[in-house]
Amino acid sequence: MLTKRIIPCLDVKDGKTVKGVNFLNLRDAGDPVELGALYSQQGADELVFLDITATLEKRGTLVELVKRVAQHINIPFTIGGGIGSIEDVSACLNAGADKVSVNSSAIKNPALIDQLSKEFGNQCIVVAIDTRNVGGMNLVHSHGGTKPTDLDTIAWAKEMQERGAGELLLTSMDKDGTKAGFANELTAYISTHVSIPIIASGGAGTMEHFTDVFTLGKADAALAASIFHFKEIAIPELKSYLSGKGIHMRK
Amino acid sequence: MKLAIVKYNAGNIQSVIYALNRLGIEPVLTDDVDELRSADKVLFPGQGEASNAMNYLRSKGLDQVIKDLKQPVFGICIGQQLLCEHSEENNTDCLGIIPAKVKKFPPLDKVPQIGWNTVTELKSPLFKGIAEESYVYFVHSYYVESNAYQIATTNYILPYACALQKDNFYAVQFHPEKSSDVGEQILKNFIEL
């Protein structure tokens, strides 16, 4: 039976892991490759590395990070952060990434997802969606969640699947950094209205929140950052807790 | 030991190379006929689309070279599917080394299957030291139908052949290079065949 996945996310800036609260106030949390290897040993099912470095040599730093991760870690990982072209994706996949995550570039040019899935197969194309409730509407936000768009989150999720996304990484900006639980209602709605896996992100604070996102939220995978980085929840305990709740986990 | 990896237009070869490096092997990535023929072991990995991959292999004459190999050959992911007779992915005639058919998952659950699933009914030296119900990592939309050359089974939507063996040809649908310690052991088993 296919298991639900626990995915630590490592936000990387200038080669170091950072984690923001509501995407602001970055704090340093160590070397991404060392941290990734530690999570892998602890039973993480996958890793996500988001490079938030904003320099002209962007692709170079991305590819260097991918190489180091792929050399040292034997579980799958996704790389994201400023990926905007076939060339970027090709460079990351050739360096050893399993999947790439595309966000703002897909908003700017939705046809990019058609091109990428045709070129590389949909299994390696993750579309990241940052969503926030604005006046009762769930709207997609771009540029690390800072810029609102007029795209309805649910319609956008469906469009991204149709264009060839293999997986959706749904981050609730309303929940991110709050530790008050995932956006279960929205996650469940999207998960049951698309036919590709959903990674839920934003709001993890307790082990119970993970139970909720897999049951109420119908998520295929759950992503979290600071609760793992700052050792508030350990992955082995989390997975054994979830197994005890009847949620299928890799042992 | 000389291990050659078939160089063609399928992606994600670098992870396999790194996984072999971790086992102390420096593989040669090549489409050179003599190098492939003279290698002790041949790996045929990759991710990609079946018809593009087959067209490329035919255009380079690699289809015949692979069929004629006598040393242990290990197909991974699309490599497994290409060793079969036919794939529903763009109605593609494959290498036909293993008489089995590749089908698309019916839309009864999420497709692609992405994540960790168990392997059972393990039947080959490839799985020496691997426990039944071990977890390995899958990413795929097409699967190999159950058949006489099946050496392991996975269940997703339906039970299917997640590993095959016929003569010197071995193949798995999952990614041993991404399957943590279990995958590492399977790669080691292939190297030690």
UniProtKB/Swiss-Prot annotation, chain A:
The active site is at D11, D130. GO terms for biological process: L-histidine biosynthetic process. It catalyses: 5-[(5-phospho-1-deoxy-D-ribulos-1-ylimino)methylamino]-1-(5-phospho-beta-D-ribosyl)imidazole-4-carboxamide + L-glutamine = D-erythro-1-(imidazol-4-yl)glycerol 3-phosphate + 5-amino-1-(5-phospho-beta-D-ribosyl)imidazole-4-carboxamide + L-glutamate + H(+). InterPro entries: Aldolase_TIM, His_biosynth, HisF, IGPS_HisA/HisF, RibuloseP-bd_barrel. Keywords: Amino-acid biosynthesis, Cytoplasm, Histidine biosynthesis, Lyase. It is an enzyme of class 4 (lyase). The keyword Cytoplasm applies. Its EC number is 4.3.2.10. Pathway: Amino-acid biosynthesis; L-histidine biosynthesis; L-histidine from 5-phospho-alpha-D-ribose 1-diphosphate: step 5/9. GO terms for cellular component: cytoplasm. GO terms for molecular function: imidazoleglycerol-phosphate synthase activity; lyase activity. It is found in: Cytoplasm. CDD domains: HisF. NCBIfam families: hisF (TIGR00735). Belongs to the HisA/HisF family. IGPS catalyzes the conversion of PRFAR and glutamine to IGP, AICAR and glutamate. The HisF subunit catalyzes the cyclization activity that produces IGP and AICAR from PRFAR using the ammonia provided by the HisH subunit. This is Imidazole glycerol phosphate synthase subunit HisF. The lineage of its organism: Bacteria, Pseudomonadati, Bacteroidota, Cytophagia, Cytophagales. The gene is hisF.
